[in-house]
Amino acid sequence: MVGSLEVSKPPEHKVESKIVIADEEEEDENDSPIEEVRLTVPITDDPSLPVLTFRTWFLGMVSCVVLAFVNNFFGYRSNPLTVSSVVAQIITLPLGKLMATTLPTTKLRLPGTNWSCSLNPGPFNMKEHVLITIFANTGAGGAYATSILTIVKAFYHRNLNPAAAMLLVQTTQLLGYGWAGMFRKYLVDSPYMWWPANLVQVSLFRALHEKEEKREGKQTKLRFFLIVFFLSFTYYIVPGYLFPSISYLSFVCWIWTRSVTAQQIGSGLHGLGIGSFGLDWSTVAGFLGSPLAVPFFAIANSFGGFIIFFYIILPIFYWSNAYEAKKFPFYTSHPFDHTGQRYNTTRILNQKTFNIDLPAYESYSKLYLSILFALIYGLSFGTLTATISHVALFDGKFIWELWKKATLTTKDKFGDVHTRLMKKNYKEVPQWWFVAVLAASFVLALYACEGFGKQLQLPWWGLLLACAIAFTFTLPIGVILATTNQRMGLNVISELIIGFLYPGKPLANVAFKTYGSVSIAQALYFVGDFKLGHYMKIPPRSMFIVQLVATIVASTVSFGTTWWLLSSVENICNTDMLPKSSPWTCPGDVVFYNASIIWGIIGPGRMFTSKGIYPGMNWFFLIGFLAPVPVWFFARKFPEKKWIHQIHIPLIFSGANVMPMAKAVHYWSWFAVGIVFNYYIFRRYKGWWARHNYILSAALDAGTAVMGVLIYFALQNNNISLPDWWGNENTDHCPLANCPTEKGIVAKGCPVF
């Protein structure tokens, strides 16, 4: 029994893999075909280690609940703070070791069964730590559907049945399990689906757990992590509290303080960001993720797409005044009317039926967007069709071969050493487990939509269509995410489809989007965690149980936190009625609300057809579909030209897909760091890169996050602030960058041309 292990004598957990590597040729067959994986993931396993222990459940559940509450709570504030699972990963290590040395070995037995577990089955091991981190990661991810609750209660000021809201939150999270189960063999077992972001976690786990002798002139991995963590932690007091402006340095604006055009060119937050950069890790990784975890070819493609869109297409459209671009701010997500003022939705919404009032709409104004926001939607259209075309051309044959091999009886021999170890040592998750979760989630989702007076507005056929979209796109989007660490979102396409089929109903639109696109995101999240478990040799059934329980717990906590805040904070999200010092401005939900206006109330039929302003954006569908074809043709014609194979059209189209939330300064900082580490250092100092790159990424994330939490609770929450000075403003000091430049348009704080 596991509980018989001696607590005082840690076992030697250095059991080598049973795979015998006889020579160089066999080593190539037995190891991963991906160099980064070979440099990071060990080909060893100890299947005797306990995993679902009392420590796993206790520390995992606490981490899940705390992170779900904290991230949901801070998400409503002016400066949202996201605490990543890396923080829990670090904190739970000493706690796990403390429990291993102090808890008794008493066994707990479940009454009426033969099941029992020990409070202390032995030394705290890496596999327990991995599952605790999975708990924490699930809690940190939040629940997207809570934004629907927020816009209903805080923006539209309508009631929503709490049972319907709870079912909405739970089912949107759980539907992804079905798609994960259907595609896990192709996205997990294949060694070519290598999930770059997981290598950061693998490196950190190894640094924290593997004993390493210090060699002369070299730091151990753990010591390196602790040094970088301390430096990152200490430094973040500067951009996080003492000098916030250092996060967005825009020198052009400081020189031309009265020129709107110069500030539009130089502003890193509201303009083109020429010459802007940030000396803050949260600026580098806050919106786009850590560039250290992204392979260089993906960075290069995204950078190329960003340059083409942001510095060629966008300026041409804006300064030629296409779509009356100069009438509106250069960089914003807000909708406008024909006079250049914010769009007033109360003038066109029937408050009784919660549908659009067409006579009122026709007498008021069509809806206008900033040219940046309009083109971002166009790129989203192109990204969808480019993804389909690219995966079909470049990966179609590969996926078909995987599909055929998955049905062979010799499945054990398929894949790399990690796949063979997992199949040899652990039982697979039965397919019916996934099907059962999918079926139960669908039935409850159907009840949430059709019951409760149909408050969600989404009919049964809308739910079926959302599920069909999720099923269709999970695999192609998963292939791209698993190989490039870049996610192709379907939010806009989901909004477009239901907006055409069921216009004028804002809640139906956001519910359809959530069931369609978020279930894909959840599926890929689950599959990504399965791949992490694959690398760390976690029993798949244990991984499934932890993910399922953590998802239900995190969704419940997120729902409870959201409902509590919406019920207890007066005028939450209403900046016109909140006190000036109130932090409850809900910045993320403002964008979500604006999207519900554009796609739900107005609808794409009045936006992207001849009835609206932007029918030209539909050309991006065709452009995106055709763009991969010449790349595929030349890659086949000139196979020796390796650089052609590295051109990735979906990544180019999605290079600016995080805009307008992310700004130019975030992109430039992200690209600069990524190119230095994953191009220059990877090629010139590969040994250092293999040893330290992913640990560096984890340490920078963790140090910044821990100091961010400390600053809030110790200083900001107690209203302890510094005297006002130039660098204490959370801005890039480019006040004119968001001014309209059309003649006669009046905007607060802006000159009238």
Curated annotation (Swiss-Prot):
Record membrane topology: Multi-pass membrane protein
Membrane spanning stretches: 56-76, 80-100, 132-152, 163-183, 224-244, 296-316, 368-388, 432-452, 461-481, 506-528, 544-564, 583-603, 615-635, 662-682, 695-715
Keywords: Membrane, Peptide transport, Protein transport, Transmembrane, Transmembrane helix, Transport
Coiled-coil boundaries: none
Tissue: Expressed predominantly in flowers, and at a very low level in leaves and roots.
InterPro entries reported in the protein's UniProt record: Oligpept_transpt, OPT
Location (main, coarse): membrane
Record flagged with keyword Protein transport: yes
GO cellular component: membrane
Location in or out of the cell: Membrane
Pfam families recorded: OPT
Gene Ontology biological process terms in this record: protein transport
MF terms (GO), sorted A to Z: oligopeptide transmembrane transporter activity
General function of this protein: Involved in the translocation of tetra- and pentapeptides across the cellular membrane in an energy-dependent manner.
Similarity annotation: Belongs to the oligopeptide OPT transporter (TC 2.A.67.1) family.
Protein's recorded name: Oligopeptide transporter 5
Species this protein is from: Arabidopsis thaliana (Mouse-ear cress)
Source lineage: Eukaryota, Viridiplantae, Streptophyta, Embryophyta, Tracheophyta
